[in-house]
Amino acid sequence: MLCILILLLHPRLCPVTKGGLGKPSGDIYTALFGAPCDCKGGTQTNNYATPTYTQVTDCGDKNAYLTYDTNWNGVSSPKWLCVRKPPSIPVINGRPGPCPSECTNNIKSQMHSSCYSSFSQCTQGNNTYFTAILQRTKSTSETNPVTSGLQPHGVLQAGCDGTVGKSVCWNQQAPIHVSDGGGPQDAVRELYVQKQIELVIQSQFPKLSYHPLARSKPRGPDIDAQMLDILSATHQALNISNPSLAQNCWLCLNQGTSMPLAFPVNISSFNASQNNCTPSLPFRVQPMPSQVYPCFFKGAQNNSFDIPVGVANFVNCSSSSNHSEALCPGPGQAFVCGNNLAFTALPANWTGSCVLAALLPDIDIISGDDPVPIPTFDYIAGRQKRAVTLIPLLVGLGVSTAVATGTAGLGVAVQSYTKLSHQLINDVQALSSTINDLQDQLDSLAEVVLQNRRGLDLLTAEQGGICLALQERCCFYANKSGIVRDKIKNLQEDLEKRRKALADNLFLTGLNGLLPYLLPFLGPLFAIILFFSFAPWILRRVTALIRDQLNSLLGKPIQIHYHQLATRDLEYGRL
């Protein structure tokens, strides 16, 4: 027992041995394969292709790769192979520099983003292109094809054409219905579509110019009126579909930009002739995985007026209806097209494939009976505590519930409760001061109004007063400022009592505020003291009991009883 206590109290006395399955240190690699920048495996100068490697080290103008080769004997010893970095393209007068010599009269129309590690911009003639070092080749492929009586259509995945390790250049804008896998060409297409939609909106609704003094201020982090309307509508819909849940629930919004949910709907009720919708900029949504639904399709005209909205690849199109005119969705619906972008209206020159979907706000619903998750303190004094990850919000500020969060949770909860109480008192105090200031302004305004009323009555005295002159009912001012001031005074007195009660509470202010933090440790400390106090007495009592039992067993005399045995001679004598 004593050795265990010494080891627990003095952990530094024990030798520490580290082990694991991590990679070896750099010294071991240097001893086995040499310094990386020495390039013992050679320097690759004919191209800039990245070899197969396990580690890479930056050596300034080149990168050192720890490569390995495979042959019929197995894997050879790794070596550091150096590959020189491609020359960077400088920026001259705000424009990218000239393209590499390999790109002369060899500009590609498309390039998949998986075929290069990084890209930059270059200029050739009066045009700007993307350029990169080609790492692999790839052929063009088609995804999500639809053949429902119309011409097959889908999104084409761009290929990679060129020599591996050499520079390639390609256009900034890919051909229509060709995707580079989320690379720069897809980003340029999204910006182009957004700009074209802005032009359509400006042509229908001219932009108003405001005076700088009349320009509205940007909204802060508070919830605006539109979001409150969305929350109200969501609660009304929930009240209709699930009244029991709507009676007591939380409606939770995600932080940051909200992405609505998109559910594909049937187009049986769609009316292609309606054109009373208002276009807006496309916004990103979260399409829900769904089954087969009909799609809207319009082929490309192969001219500069086409607006490629992309191809909806999150749903399998059961059929495809061809439309050559502008389309408007129904109320509460939108067209979801490529890259999960939703359009409230499709212009006449759109091209691509879209799905009609209903939009719902991204709101999480938590029942009022369930606990609302809040963060917990997992690390106290450098040691990780066993704490409940999710605790109720309304009960988590109390003392009893905080015991479940660990030994340190009680002190933190009590201190947090104290700070919250002070904060609430200060907030209510500030609110009462604000109401008092508003009441002063109202009193001043009332005095001005009464003065104006008396002046108007004097001016219209010959006509019987202002009321007869206007042929209206006379209005009189009912001054209730005294009632408001009395309520504010009572509120301030109550706040002062609460502040004094918190200050006089020894449980919260004892030992200069350290008592709430010491209380969690007093229980275990008191238990340890009781254990070491009564353990010797209990040990003595048990030892004495065992000794008495042994003595009583060993002290008893051994009694031997003799009995006369019958012999066979006596039996024969009787005979």
From Swiss-Prot:
CDD domains: HTLV-1-like_HR1-HR2. Glycans are attached at residues 126, 239, 266, 271, 302, 316, 322, 349, 479. A motif (CX6CC) lies at residues 467-475. Specific enzymatic cleavages in vivo yield mature proteins. Envelope glycoproteins are synthesized as an inactive precursor that is N-glycosylated and processed likely by host cell furin or by a furin-like protease in the Golgi to yield the mature SU and TM proteins. The cleavage site between SU and TM requires the minimal sequence [KR]-X-[KR]-R. The CXXC motif is highly conserved across a broad range of retroviral envelope proteins. It is thought to participate in the formation of a labile disulfide bond possibly with the CX6CC motif present in the transmembrane protein. Isomerization of the intersubunit disulfide bond to an SU intrachain disulfide bond is thought to occur upon receptor recognition in order to allow membrane fusion. Residues 390-410 are annotated as: Fusion peptide. The surface protein (SU) attaches the virus to the host cell by binding to its receptor. This interaction triggers the refolding of the transmembrane protein (TM) and is thought to activate its fusogenic potential by unmasking its fusion peptide. Fusion occurs at the host cell plasma membrane. The transmembrane protein (TM) acts as a class I viral fusion protein. Under the current model, the protein has at least 3 conformational states: pre-fusion native state, pre-hairpin intermediate state, and post-fusion hairpin state. During viral and target cell membrane fusion, the coiled coil regions (heptad repeats) assume a trimer-of-hairpins structure, positioning the fusion peptide in close proximity to the C-terminal region of the ectodomain. The formation of this structure appears to drive apposition and subsequent fusion of viral and target cell membranes. The mature envelope protein (Env) consists of a trimer of SU-TM heterodimers attached by a labile interchain disulfide bond. Residues 1-19 form the signal peptide. GO terms for cellular component: host cell plasma membrane; membrane; viral envelope; virion membrane. This is Envelope glycoprotein. Residues 411-461, 471-507 form a coiled coil. The keyword Transmembrane helix applies. A motif (YXXL motif) lies at residues 562-565. It comes from Squirrel monkey retrovirus (SMRV-H). Residues 539-575 are cytoplasmic. Pfam families: TLV_coat. Residues 20-517 are extracellular. The YXXL motif is involved in determining the exact site of viral release at the surface of infected mononuclear cells and promotes endocytosis. Disulfide bonds join 249-252, 249-475, 467-474. Residues 450-466 are annotated as: Immunosuppression. A motif (CXXC) lies at residues 249-252. Keywords: Cleavage on pair of basic residues, Coiled coil, Disulfide bond, Fusion of virus membrane with host cell membrane, Fusion of virus membrane with host membrane, Glycoprotein, Host cell membrane, Host membrane, Host-virus interaction, Membrane, Signal, Transmembrane, Transmembrane helix, Viral attachment to host cell, Viral envelope protein, Viral penetration into host cytoplasm, Virion, Virus entry into host cell.
